Amino acid sequence: MIRIPATRAFLPALAAGFVVFAVTLAAADVLNFPTVRADLTTEQLKRVQDITRPTTDFSKAEPYEAMESGATTSIAPVSRDIFSHPSANLGLDREQNFHLGNALFRQLWVSSPSSTQATDGLGPLFNARSCQSCHIRDGRGHPLETAGQPATSMVLRLARPAITPEEAQSLRDFKAINFPDATYGAQLQDLAVPGLAAEGKVTVSYSEETVTLKDGETVTLRKPHFGVGDLAYGPLGEATTISARVAPAMIGLGLIEAIPEADILTNADPDDKNGDGIHGRAAIVRDHRTGQIALGRFGWKAQNATVRDQVADAFSADIGISTPDRPNPYGDCTAKEPRCLTMPNGVQKRLGDTEAAGPILPLVTFYSENLAVPARRKASFPDVLHGKETFYRSGCAACHTPKFVTRDDLKDSDGKDAPQAFQLIWPYSDFLLHDMGEGLSDGQQVGVASGRDWRTPPLWGIGLTQTVSGQQAYLHDGRARTLTEAILWHGGEAERARNAFADLSTDDRQALINFLESL
């Protein structure tokens, strides 16, 4: 078992004027996680270690490199719907559930009461009417470009730090990741059902900074400044922070959940014992459904442990739909929004105790777990291989870990081997938290993550962003309009890699971008 000292996971006090408490990893000083995979024989484990070792040969593509998600990889032709295909090894018997989940993912929910009783319950406060509204064709959302427009595929998370000993203890016990605004809850909802005022509008302005690279090329970076306007229920709390979050792509989520804890934690180095300047930390959370301590993997700050938890969270916060895992039919409404709590809800007792009753949550979860990663393009092209070598040489792979092998003991609910079982995958992420510098800080604590900490996002499919979403928008708030801009925003632990990129020759820098676009 790996023992993580509690003193290595603390959050610095960032808010002046408030009693801020350190968040430790456990009251008993340590958390125990497995250090060795229990699903493999000794011989299998050695094979996995050999095949996942970083390559040193960039003269040719590695075996199976083009199949980024193993046997689940989609080899469908590139189109705007390339992120919407099922795991290639799903099988006809399970594709029916995938397509049912897809229909529910695209379903437009309506307010109550409605003649379509199985699909009512929207809101009362909400950000979008469907999952697909945020995850455009199962890809990334769009950032808000102009103040006053609905921020449909981007949300503002609201949170404050602990201000009482009891709240601090909740953080230490992982029973809370932060605390909502007293009036507006954990998220600003800029839409509402008829008869109710929306909470407010997202405002944004951008400032620009020009960066000159070593070869003389200039790149303009834009920094967003988000705020809230037209607040309907009074001001935000003085301690409330806001953080813009663009919806991420949906591909490969089931594979990410299938990576063994031990393999992720092997890359954690909170004390930087190897001296490379990288000190990735595990996100420790609770599985919302079971209440058990778990490894966070999903969300911009790795605040959710499972795909199901992520889906239930989105149903509740974004659409205002209750599920068995989050049964409140009023979503993010608070006691200071009393009219919201008197609006009709969509609970139909003959269907169940929640608005998304019966199989809805499991089907949308299954769909989300089985959106296939597309096969790579041009993996063997000389310029892409050169870019791959430059990616490694610049230090990018220190956080963007190229490959894993998923668990071999995964079963679906029907007892059959899960499609994600024992696959060699290439997500290019370590799924750990890293300090990304003040430039990307949102000042918002999320569990063991401070405002400067972000989960390393997987890079698979990143080269198809424009094709699927209709525009390029990278990083948590979509500020980066190109991959070059995204890299130049890296700071903190990633500053060395960022500077190495900025110092590359024009040809080397373009080769690295070509490599990323091939993913």
Predicted features, each with a name:
Residues 8, 23-27:
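N-terminal regions of proteins, emphasizing targeting and processing segments when present
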Residues 1-7:
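N-terminal secretory signal peptides that target proteins for export/translocation
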Residues 26-519:
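Periplasmic c-type cytochrome electron-transfer domains
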Residues 12-22:
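Bacterial N-terminal signal peptides
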